[in-house]
UniProtKB/Swiss-Prot annotation:
Stretches for region Disordered: 67-87
GO terms under biological process: translation
Superkingdom in the source lineage: Bacteria
The protein's name: Small ribosomal subunit protein bS20
Keywords of this entry: Ribonucleoprotein, Ribosomal protein, RNA-binding, rRNA-binding
Protein family according to the UniProt entry: Belongs to the bacterial ribosomal protein bS20 family.
Gene3D superfamilies attached to this UniProt entry: Ribosomal protein S20
Gene: rpsT
Statement: the UniProt record of this protein carries the keyword Cell membrane: no
Amino acid sequence: MANIKSKQKAILYNQKANAYNSAVKSTVKTAIKKAKLAADQQDAKLSDFVSKAHHEIDKAVSKGVLHKNNGSRKASRLDAYVQSKQQ
């Protein structure tokens, strides 16, 4: 543990930020998995799952958890996956 008070506070802040970022990333991954599963099963609510995944990705990008390009890549790959399963 750090000896300087400001560094102790910084460590606590970083731990909180890490927990938040991990939770948001987990939510994004779960939404993508659900959308892919719906695409595999030809689910009737596929568009709902895909839009939910896009919403979670966009929210993570706007909060600064994911980089803009990373979010775009995730959304693009999800769309390509869904498109390949619909053919």
